[in-house]
Amino acid sequence: MPTFHIEMFEGRSADQKRKLVEEVTRVTCETLGCAPGAVDIIIAEVKRENWATGGVLWSEQK
């Protein structure tokens, strides 16, 4: 069973997350030939103060 871990900044709506998991599931099933019930998706929402790129926290980027 494919399992996807998606990390993203917090703040997206339930509708946006619903659409995301529907599309990831659809493409996975088309590509791998598996049933939708075999696809697990875990969304982890991260605060900008806990994510850095290039040594700079996203909460401090301009």
From Swiss-Prot:
GO terms for MF: isomerase activity
Catalytic residues identified in the record: 2
Enzyme class: isomerase
Swiss-Prot/TrEMBL keywords: Isomerase
Catalytic activity, EC: 5.3.2.-
Pfam families reported for this sequence: Tautomerase
SUPFAM superfamilies, per database record: Tautomerase/MIF (SSF55331)
NCBIfam families: PRK00745.1, PRK02220.1, taut
Protein family (similarity comment): Belongs to the 4-oxalocrotonate tautomerase family.
Name of this protein: Probable tautomerase RSc0807
Organism: Ralstonia nicotianae (strain ATCC BAA-1114 / GMI1000) (Ralstonia solanacearum)
